[in-house]
Each structure stands twice: as C-alpha cells, then as structure tokens.
Amino acid sequence: MTFGRGFSYMGNQVHYDKLGHDHWVDLLFFNRILKSLVVIELKKGSFKPAYLGQLAAYLRVLDDEERIEGENPSVGIVLCKDADRAYVEYVLQDYTKPMGVATYKSSQERLRELLPDEEEIKKLL
C-alpha cells in the first residue's frame, strides 16, 4: 500500500473500549502534514452506507481518546472493492466528520494487468 507524504504507521487492529463497546480500527496512521490521526477501514466488498456510521464512531472515539492539543480532527477513509461515486457523494453529504471512500484493485487483478496473457507465454515457450 502506497501513501503520500507524512504518514506514520501506528498500528493495525487497534482496540478501543468506549462506554463498554469494543472498537477495532483496521489501520491507524498519523499524518504529520495534516497533524491528524488517519483511520483506514478495509472492506472486501462493495461500499455500503453502514461503513460510514462505523467510521464516524471510530473517529469520535479517536478524537476523545487519542487526539492531543494542537492536532486536527481525525480523518477516516473506507477502502473497499468498488463504489458508485455518485451514491457515495450523496450519502456523505450529511456527515460532518472528515471522511472519504476509496477503491482498490486486488493483487490478483493487478498481477493480471502486469503479467503477459496465456497466449503470449505460450509463444515464448
């Protein structure tokens, strides 16, 4: 996974217990440039609006438990297999926390793009 400048890894599957409820953050970073904690939630399938509710809860807990004076509010990213951009933007309108949704390509798909196809390999043999 490649990130932009300023990211420092803080942990994966980071556990927080808030008011008797368990929260498990998939990936936690701190961005020195943004001066913010950054949560990345990894999802195997397509985007679902419920992911934003989960992410909003994580951001609230992080801002209460981890954020220190001088830091900006925590930022959240849902990383899922695919998402309808128009639908994501529509759903995000009512959220006030800094959140976004991004998509990924699985390693297998990426490898298929990079490797020669079966016919090209046969020609080489």
Where are these regions (language model features)?
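Charged, terminal alpha-helix-loop-beta segments
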Residues: 1-125
